[in-house]
């Protein structure tokens, strides 16, 4: 682990000071420890919601000689988590180095292939099924790897599991901070994504079990869910992009910029083309828009286990461990 020594040094200082113990879940969790091996650093880094408040409150932050910068340190450790626990690991490293370029090129190439192929909406079903299987396996492997290193061997009480799930779904530790809109945009993005997934699932049910082919009526469940989810994703990702570009450079890890922008760009493009497809589904533009949309969705799927999406899974796991410790 590249930042193990620096992490242990900074947390020893923070453990002696404890001025920030009321800011979030990280500092009470830190106070329950006297040593900080790599597994504990992975846990604390993913428990952090990156609000940055501790940096502005810290009397030992740069230019002090102690140079305590917890937000930046934990951001760097989180990136190590993404790489260390990803499967396959080589793809995670490649995506980290040029995330935006990889994401855009992948979407463009897949869209071009789909345009060149026979224009049958259902021709790509097998391809998407294979991609979905890969995503489920890769994310599951990553979650298991993370829990083995940064989790706990204690049993998981039902109350602790429910509390951890609630903290994750409500973004409890994004409720404070100088930019409250960050929590709102995260909610719009996360729940927009879930609504789009629900729309796809309902559409699959209608097609395979009810034998109803797309396009579906405007007031049908797939269209309503997809429209609401797409709008949420569009606004949420645009807001997160603005906040990302405005974020104080002193507390962010520049090495993650490509990965972050790649993920945001794919989410935004997926929602934008999905809404455009709805509006143009009875025009001659529909096949081209459909190809771009399917290309964006497939590119998003293929990069989910190797990019910023995994931060939600590891953070939920860290919140679960925190809930177990509190009980």
Functional labels for PLM-detected ranges:
Residues 16, 40-51, 227-230, 257-264:
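Secondary-structure capping and boundary motifs in well-ordered enzyme cores
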Residues 32, 36-202, 206-209:
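Iron-sulfur-cluster electron-transfer modules
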Residues 3-6, 90-93, 119-122, 177-183, ...:
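Juxtamembrane loop-transmembrane helix junctions in multi-pass integral membrane proteins
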Residues 1-48, 320, 326-327:
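Ferredoxin-type iron-sulfur electron-transfer modules and their immediate structural context
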Residues 207-212, 248-252:
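Short acidic alpha-helical/loop segments enriched in Asp/Glu that coordinate divalent cations
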Residues 101-115, 125-143, 159, 163, ...:
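Hydrophobic cores of alpha-helical transmembrane segments in multi-pass integral membrane proteins
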Residues 173-175, 246-250:
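Helix-loop boundary elements of multi-pass alpha-helical membrane proteins
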Residues 25, 59, 314:
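A short local structural element in Rossmann-fold oxidoreductases
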């Amino acid at each position: 682990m590249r930042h193990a020594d620096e992490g242990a040094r900074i947390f020893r200082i923070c453990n002696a000071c404890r001025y920030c113990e009321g800011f979030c879940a990280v500092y009470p969790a830190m106070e329950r420890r006297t040593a900080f091996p790599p597994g504990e650093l992975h846990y604390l880094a993913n428990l952090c919601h990156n609000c940055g408040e501790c940096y502005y409150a810290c009397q030992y932050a740069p230019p002090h000689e102690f140079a305590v910068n917890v937000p930046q340190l934990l951001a760097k450790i989180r990136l190590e988590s993404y790489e260390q626990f990803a499967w396959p690991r080589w793809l995670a490293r490649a995506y980290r180095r040029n995330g935006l370029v990889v994401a855009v090129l992948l979407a463009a190439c897949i869209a071009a292939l789909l345009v060149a192929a026979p224009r049958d909406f259902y021709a790509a079903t097998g391809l998407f099924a294979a991609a979905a299987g890969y995503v489920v396996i890769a994310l599951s492997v990553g979650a298991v790897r993370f829990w083995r290193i940064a989790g706990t061997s204690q049993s998981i009480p039902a109350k602790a599991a429910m509390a951890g799930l609630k903290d994750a779904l409500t973004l409890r530790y994004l409720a404070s901070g100088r930019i409250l809109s960050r929590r709102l945009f995260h909610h719009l993005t996360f729940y927009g994504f879930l609504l789009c997934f629900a729309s796809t699932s309902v559409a699959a049910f209608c097609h395979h079990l009810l034998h109803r082919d797309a396009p579906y009526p405007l007031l049908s469940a797939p269209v309503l869910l997809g429209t609401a989810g797409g709008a949420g994703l569009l606004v949420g990702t645009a807001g997160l992009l603005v906040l990302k570009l405005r974020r104080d450079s002193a507390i962010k890890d520049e090495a993650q910029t490509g990965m972050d922008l790649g993920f945001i760009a794919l989410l935004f493009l997926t929602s934008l083309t999905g809404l455009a497809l709805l509006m143009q589904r009875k025009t001659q533009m529909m096949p081209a828009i459909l190809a771009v949309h399917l290309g964006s969705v497939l590119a998003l799927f293929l990069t989910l286990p190797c990019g910023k999406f995994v931060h939600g899974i590891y953070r939920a796991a860290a919140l679960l461990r925190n809930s177990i410790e509190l009980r």
